[in-house]
Regions:
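Amphipathic alpha-helical assembly/interaction segments
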Residues: 5-8, 12-15, 45-46, 64, ...
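All-alpha RGS (Regulator of G-protein Signaling) helical domain and cognate RGS-like helical scaffolds
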Residues: 19-25, 39-43, 100-107, 122-126
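Helix-loop segments that flank and shape redox-cofactor active sites
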Residues: 28-54, 113-130
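Acidic/His metal-coordination segments adjacent to aromatic residues that form catalytic metal sites
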Residues: 2-20, 78-107
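Amphipathic alpha-helical hairpins/coiled-coils and adjacent low-complexity
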Residues: 102-105, 109-145
């Protein structure tokens, strides 16, 4: 196994799957962190959670904008919904209120690592809009809790 080998570029169908999963994940994380920001269980982290929730909600919109609406890709969109390597991530946030901030850190770190790896599979020309979205999301998460 060549550790320095370049991964195969994404097909259109694979891109659809990636963007569906990222949109759904961003929505799920936004909803959870938004709930945390207003439930009063951890006042010290509520402002951070509200900020992250708003950003993740916007990221979901950006990912959704990357999903082609062609009827030819309906099967790929449907199959991708609720699946993927990131599908179990929201479950990692099933923690006590006092552990919320600590739980968010590795989840966002994992998302960032996933996006960096995904960017390596995208073409600088054909996938320029997706690469731009990844760069925007990464920049937006630069000040995430660590």
């Amino acid at each position: 196994m060549d550790l320095h080998a370049t991964p195969d570029p994404l097909t259109i169908a694979e891109g659809v799957a990636e963007f569906v999963v990222l949109a759904e994940l961003s929505t799920a994380l936004s909803e959870r962190l938004g709930e945390w920001s207003t439930d009063g269980a951890d006042p010290d982290s509520s402002a951070t959670m509200a900020s992250l929730a708003a950003r993740l909600d916007e990221h979901s919109t950006w990912w959704t904008g990357r999903i082609p609406e062609s009827v030819l890709l309906e099967g790929e969109r449907t199959a991708a919904s609720g699946s993927g390597q990131l599908a179990e991530v929201p479950g990692l946030l099933d923690v006590a209120a006092s552990d919320r901030r600590a739980a968010v850190e590795p989840v966002l770190d994992r998302l960032v690592a996933y996006l960096v790896a995904l960017a390596e599979r995208l073409s600088p020309l054909g996938d320029a809009p997706a690469l731009r979205t990844i760069r925007l999301v990464l920049a937006d998460l630069e000040d995430r809790p660590r």
